[in-house]
Amino acid sequence: MDNNDYKKFYLIREDVLPESVVKTLKIKDALKNNPELSIYEAVKLFDLSRSAFYKYRETIFPVDEKMLDHREFTLILYVNDIVGMLAQVLNTVSKLQLSVLTIHQSVPMEEKATITLSLSAKDTTISIDEIIKALRNIEHVSKVELISMSM
């Protein structure tokens, strides 16, 4: 592949996307869920110009959509330094049918630590959002962030 053809990818939160990009995602979802809906009808329904839809439709996609092919990603968990914390996290990972590729737990400072997990979700259909929510629901986990993903 020529270096001029390479396009960089970014993970970006939905709430900071321009309205036209968010509408494009909604239109793509509507078209996927209703094969009888035409592009003309869909852009009217979501009040977006066809030119804006065509501009963004091949450049924006939900993280989970790309994860279907390559289901490897890395998360960082911010946790309280509690005995058995890592075991609780790994138990949840196991219940979600995820495979651990790499794991690193930082040295605790001020009773806080981080756990970095590289995971494979090839044996499950659960979405990345559901995985993050499940890990956030563990007692003493204060934050979970997606920091990388294979594409």
Swiss-Prot record:
Cite the ACT domain residue spans from the record: 74-149
SUPFAM superfamilies per the UniProt record, alphabetical? ACT-like
Q: Which Gene3D superfamilies match?
A: 3.30.70.260
The record's similarity note reads: Belongs to the UPF0735 family.
Q: Which InterPro entries match?
A: ACT-like_dom_sf, ACT_dom, UPF0735_ACT_dom-cont
Q: What is this protein called?
A: UPF0735 ACT domain-containing protein SH1278
HAMAP family reported in the protein's UniProt record: UPF0735 (MF_00707)
User: What domain of life does the UniProt record list for this protein's source?
Assistant: Bacteria
